[in-house]
Amino acid sequence: MNGDPGESGHIPGARVVAAYKGGSQDIPSSADRVEQYAAEIRAKYGVEIVPDIATLLTKVDAVLLESGDGRAHLSQARPVIAAHKPLFIDKPLASTLEDAREIARLAAEAHVPWFSSSSLRFGAIGASMKFPDVTGVFTWGPGPFEPHHYLDLSWYAVHPIEVLYTIMGRGCVSVTRTAGEFGDVIVGRWADGRLGTVNAVRPYSDYGVVVIRGREVVESRPKASAAVDYRALVVEMVKFFQTGAPPVPNEETLEMFAFMDAAQKSKEQGGKAVSLR
């Protein structure tokens, strides 16, 4: 957005003018990089670094909430919603189902548009594997945990879960989860009888999906590089800020968190089937 308009990857229509650093001291990937990133966007792109969210809100038309820590998102979203600024919240929307629903409730009461998404929804995998006759889906991707996120799948496995919902849509009624040392397998049962499976691989893996269409089985290509391209998501952000129309239904995002909540409870109960709440 802030690059040279002549560059091939430039995205017109919006510009980042100010940022608040934030950061989480108990997450090394946040604490160890926030100062470096702040210095880079200030020097390279002319972004003003401000001391707090309140100051930020006086300088912008819309907000990208890019904190990697889902625990912080509710408290950070509150002032943005109160200021009636359109809001994109990067993954994970929250670290609990309750926080996710509270963000949605506050935004609905204030009539503030918002959305949250993994970049994989709009990348090569998500965009190429949507078919009208899907009867089953198997997705996989990295599944490392952070101990402070109650919904442990929300930390990283949210990516393949987002792909699952991109293809399957809403309608999951129950979830079972089998936990292992090298990964977890989560199976959702949809109300229409379809099954959607996620393999959260540890420590890391590429991304991919297999779609069942009657007798035909389709596997995604490529699995990794194009799948994590962030540009397509940024294009959707700019459209959203211009129109106020979320590219992902809020209800679908909230069901994803109900899916992860049920998966967490299934894990705690030794793999029993748990209904979404």
Model-inferred region functions:
Residues 38, 160-161, 230, 234, ...:
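A general structural signal for well-ordered alpha-helical segments in protein cores
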Residues 1-83, 105-109, 170, 269, ...:
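N-terminal glycine-/serine-/threonine-rich beta1-alpha1-beta2 phosphate-ribose binding loop
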Residues 55, 64, 240-277:
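C-terminal helix-rich "cap/oligomerization" subdomain common to oxidoreductases
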Residues 140-206, 251-258:
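Rossmann-like dinucleotide-binding domain that binds NAD(P)(H)
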Residues 61, 84-86, 90-93, 244:
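Alpha-helical hinge/cap motifs
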Residues 88, 93-150, 160:
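A contiguous active-site-proximal alpha/beta segment in oxidoreductase catalytic domains
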Residues 205-245:
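Interdomain hinge/lid region at the active-site interface
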Residues 51, 89, 116-118, 176-179:
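Short loop/edge segments at beta-strand edges and connector loops
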